[in-house]
Design a protein with these regions (language model features):
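Flexible, low-complexity linker and terminal segments
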Residues: 1-8, 130-340, 345-346, 357-358, ...
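Thiamine diphosphate
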Residues: 1-133, 161, 225, 287, 371-508, 518-520, ...
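Short acidic, glycine/serine/threonine-rich loops at helix termini
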Residues: 34-37, 58-60, 81-85, 107-114, ...
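Short helix-loop-beta junction
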Residues: 37-43, 243-253, 470-476
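A glycine-rich helix N-cap at a beta->alpha junction
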Residues: 43-49, 91-102, 182-188, 428-441, ...
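Conserved thiamine diphosphate
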Residues: 104-153, 159, 191-197, 402-404, ...
Length: 576
């Protein structure tokens, strides 16, 4: 049977068909749907882990136990999982282990545009890269086989376009493998120096064998055109752009195995043409490899640069000098920047922080939008968990000057991911810092995934729920309080009180995400135009349900969830 599938959905199907038994991931766009889709198969155990490091260690443990395993994450998640990744490159596997890392070329939903191929190279872990949904499924299945053949975890690199675009996929039956035997082998899995030295020798020998495999594998294929004016070496989503933009005007070497890269295959292909262009998104890894192996008739980054995606129009203009028209919407869609939803519980908190003129150390989540107009409340956003650690450093640097006017904001899921250790640091090192945990009862930004505080697991079954108040107290924070961000006066008073204290404190701003299905909304509010004076104070909240018409505020009843923040804000009582 054939089916139209997203790349991530096809990836999940590949996990299922390959006989994968254990899946542990942390949600992160554009990788999230892989784990959500594979969780629908009863034959696969799937979970959300607290962070990517835990997910990778769980998958490695399952592999050592004899089960094919998988962990998935976005590109910045691989930074978090780098510690086990680099050592897993030494230990190798028992049963096959596959890692998905989804890069976000163009930074559609990310804080940086790093190229995950660097991690594969540095960790000496092989990496494959599909270009469409069919390849997603087939590459995953092959990755498990190669993982067991070469005794290595295999990374499959995804991109936003491949993950979230669709193509036809042939459905096949699941391969039931059973558990491989487990035998105690400390020289393989106990990475103390005496054993690790021997494994490093193994890794280098394995890399040589992988390079030999890269020379002949069908993953790397040459597509010769008799009308070719030049050659192109490409990979991933860029391959699709190349084929559409250049057609038969170029011969193409498509690299589906991007670490390690072949040598002779590239040399032989490049020798056929006076000029070869390397078209790869982000860093010039393939281009640099070409030059390292003596292929000097290549150009790449000097033409295409290091930033963002490489759409068909760019490739056609740069290489053919043509401004070609490609299938697209006739009219430009008006820009609609992301905003907090109507009724978002974070809005009231950020309004209070802005009103008080507080310096805010931000984090990763929906609440990052607190940095946008009209709230403009957040001063810094670095990475998961950095809000708390950064606050501690900020206050240690500036002392009393900042201690009573600076806070950290972090979501419940992000706090469980990597915020806890920062709070331990605050307690342990006697930091006079105020942390605000934005508890909206879900992992919101990536699409409502469960987390260790929600009381449910990935499949929706009951699970232990971490009590944030008790956890913060156990860490050593004596001042812990809960506020409702819909109540502006209460929230503002709590912030003032905790900032005035001479010890560390935690405010848990608790209100479920307004988009959760079980959340009951209040009747929508409306504006009494006779009372409205057009002061625009309600507009300062940045609620999408509120706009101005003929000098008066208007509330869209189809969007309003009745949170009441605007009513509390209105000084003339015009909102009823």
């Amino acid at each position: 049977m054939k089916k139209l599938m997203l790349g991530n959905e096809a990836f999940a199907r590949g996990l299922y068909e390959a006989g994968c038994k254990v899946v542990s991931s942390y949600p992160g766009t554009p990788s999230t749907e892989i784990t959500e889709e594979v969780a629908k198969y009863d034959e696969v155990y799937a979970e959300w882990a607290p962070n990517e490091k835990v997910a990778m260690e769980t998958a490695l443990g399952a592999s050592i136990a004899g089960a094919r395993s998988f962990c998935g994450m976005k590109h910045v998640g691989l930074n978090v999982a780098a510690d086990p990744l680099y050592t897993a490159g030494y230990t190798g596997v028992n049963a096959g282990m596959v890692i998905a890392v989804a890069d976000d070329q163009g930074m559609h939903s990310s804080q940086n545009e790093q190229d995950s191929r660097h991690h594969a190279i540095a960790s000496k872990v092989p990496m494959l890269e599909p270009s469409d949904s069919t390849e997603c499924k087939e590459f995953v299945k092959l990755a498990f086989e190669l993982s067991e053949k070469f005794d290595a975890p295999f990374i499959v690199r995804m991109s936003t376009r491949v993950a979230h675009s669709q193509s036809i996929v042939e459905m096949e039956d699941r391969q039931e493998l059973g558990l491989k035997p487990y035998e105690k082998t400390p020289q393989k899995f106990v990475m103390m120096p005496a054993y690790a030295k021997g494994r490093h020798v193994f890794v280098e020998e394995r890399t040589k064998k992988l390079i030999e495999y890269a020379e002949t594998t069908p993953l790397n294929r040459v597509e010769i055109s008799d009308k070719a004016e030049f050659g192109v070496i490409t990979n991933g989503a860029a391959y699709q752009y190349v084929k559409e933009a250049l057609g038969d005007k170029a011969s193409v070497l498509k690299l589906g195995m991007v670490n390690p890269l072949p040598e002779k295959l590239i040399q032989d292909f490049a020798a056929k043409y006076e000029q070869v262009y390397v078209i790869e998104e982000l860093d010039g890894i393939i281009e640099e490899h070409c030059r390292n192996i003596g292929v000097n008739n290549v150009k790449g980054k000097e033409i295409f640069g290091y930033i963002g995606e490489l759409p068909q129009s760019v490739i056609a203009e740069k290489l053919l000098g043509e401004k070609k028209e490609f299938a697209a919407l006739e009219d430009n869609i008006p820009v609609r920047p992301p905003v907090m939803c109507p009724g978002c519980p974070h809005r009231g908190l950020f309004y209070c922080l802005k009103k008080l003129g507080v310096t805010v150390s931000g984090d990763i989540g929906c609440y990052t939008l607190g940095a946008a107009a009209p709230l403009n409340a957040i001063d810094t956003t670095i990475c998961m968990g950095a809000s708390i650690s950064g606050l501690h450093g900020f206050n240690k640097a500036r002392g009393a000057e900042s201690e009573h006017n600076t806070v950290a904001v972090i979501g419940d899921s992000t706090f469980m991911h990597s915020g806890m250790t920062g709070l331990v640091n605050i307690a342990y090192n006697n930091s006079n810092s105020t942390v605000i945990i934005l508890d909206n009862s879900i992992t919101g930004m990536t699409g409502h995934q469960q987390n260790p505080t929600t009381g449910k697991n990935l499949k929706g079954d009951p699970a232990a729920a971490v009590n944030l108040e008790e956890l913060c107290k156990a860490i050593g924070i004596k001042r812990v309080r809960v506020t409702d961000p819909y109540k502006l006066a209460e929230t503002e008073a709590a912030i003032k009180e905790e900032l005035a204290a001479d010890e560390a404190s935690v405010i848990i701003s608790r209100r479920p995400c307004a988009l959760l299905k079980y959340v009951k909304h209040n009747p929508p509010f409306k504006v009494n135009t006779e009372k409205c004076v057009g002061c625009k104070m309600c507009m300062k909240l940045g609620c999408p349900a509120i706009s101005m018409r003929d000098g008066k505020a208007v509330i869209d009843h189809t969007q309003c969830v009745g949170c009441g923040i605007c009513k509390e804000q209105c000084k003339v009582g015009a909102i009823e």
